[in-house]
């Protein structure tokens, strides 16, 4: 197997692991939502799951490959159109982001109705000033929406799609996954705190900014992803095949 095929297989395995871990953490929504990865050796082709498969069914071998026009070039022709629109927005406009993750987790989606999601705990400081917002435009089936999604996300790889869900992107599977992990965690805490009648203590913008800079020394997913892959192996190693 040549180097390109080996690289492609590793991307497939990492992407399949993201699906299985999303199911494990309870962030999936039956067959809906989507996670994608740019195919090595191509400029705009990317892998996504076959429409109709639940996340616990996804494995490296049953992913499909899609080109920039939305044509399935490898695998069955079962394509989620909204998934293609949302993910191609990032793959076409942010080449530094190789993995893209869209989710509507039940525990956090209510926070997408906030004008802006407040920060309350240490973990969310790593996202301070890095989260973009995109207003809901109805179902994401209009190709014209792609440039607005890409512009609103910016280079931070974090986007709250208001009244809809969340979108994260990263150079690696681990970075992309852990951005989603911390974004969901931030929203869960925000919902819990804002539902309380107790007086809230919060830090100053200067403190949040300083903590955000401190977190830049830690790359999301660098240490967590190997541990998450080991967890995936213990849960069900069939994702690799």
Show which residues each predicted segment covers.
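Glycine-rich flexible loops
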Residues: 1-241
């Amino acid at each position: 197997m040549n180097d390109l095929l080996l690289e492609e297989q590793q991307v497939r395995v990492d992407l399949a692991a993201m699906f299985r871990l999303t199911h494990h953490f309870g962030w999936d929504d039956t067959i809906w939502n989507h996670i994608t990865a740019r195919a090595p050796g191509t400029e705009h082709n990317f892998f996504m799951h076959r429409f109709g498969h639940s996340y616990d069914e996804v494995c490296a071998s049953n992913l499909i490959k899609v080109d920039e026009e939305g044509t399935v070039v490898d695998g069955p022709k079962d394509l989620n159109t909204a998934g293609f629109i949302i993910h191609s927005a990032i793959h076409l406009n942010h080449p530094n982001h190789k993995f893209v993750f869209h989710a509507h987790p039940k525990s956090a989606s209510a926070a997408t109705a906030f004008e802006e999601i407040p920060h309350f705990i240490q973990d969310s400081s790593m996202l301070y000033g890095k989260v973009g917002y995109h207003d809901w435009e109805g179902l994401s089936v209009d190709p014209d929406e792609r440039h607005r999604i890409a512009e609103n996300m910016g280079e931070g790889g974090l986007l709250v799609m208001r009244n809809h869900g969340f979108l994260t992107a990263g150079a690696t599977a681990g970075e992309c996954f852990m951005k989603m992990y911390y974004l969901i965690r931030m929203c869960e805490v925000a919902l819990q705190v804002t539902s309380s009648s107790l007086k809230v203590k919060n830090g100053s913008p200067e403190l949040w900014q300083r903590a955000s800079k401190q977190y830049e020394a830690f790359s999301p997913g660098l240490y967590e992803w190997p541990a998450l892959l080991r967890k995936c192996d213990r849960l069900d190693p069939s994702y690799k095949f």
